[in-house]
Amino acid sequence: MTKIDIQYQDQFGKWRHLQSKHNEGDAYRSASNRARSTGKRHRLVDQDGTLLDVIEP
């Protein structure tokens, strides 16, 4: 079972950890909703560090 980390980009351009999920669809939905509400870029990264997706607000 893969772990997916949700990260967001702060005002200085540094990626910060937000939370981890095991379901990719749920992770995308959470990141997408939070990107829209906060106006910050979010990304999904798997446990190997592979970039899965970047969500723009």
PLM segments and residue spans:
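Short aromatic-glycine-(Arg/Gly/Cys) micro-motifs in beta-strand/loop hairpins
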Residues: M1-H17, D46
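Sterically constrained small-residue positions within well-ordered secondary structures
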Residues: L18, N33-A35
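Solvent-exposed serine/threonine-rich low-complexity stretches and specific carbohydrate-binding patches
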Residues: Q19-N23, E56-P57
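Charged, amphipathic alpha-helical segments
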Residues: H22-A31
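Short, mixed-charge low-complexity intrinsically disordered segments
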Residues: A35-P57
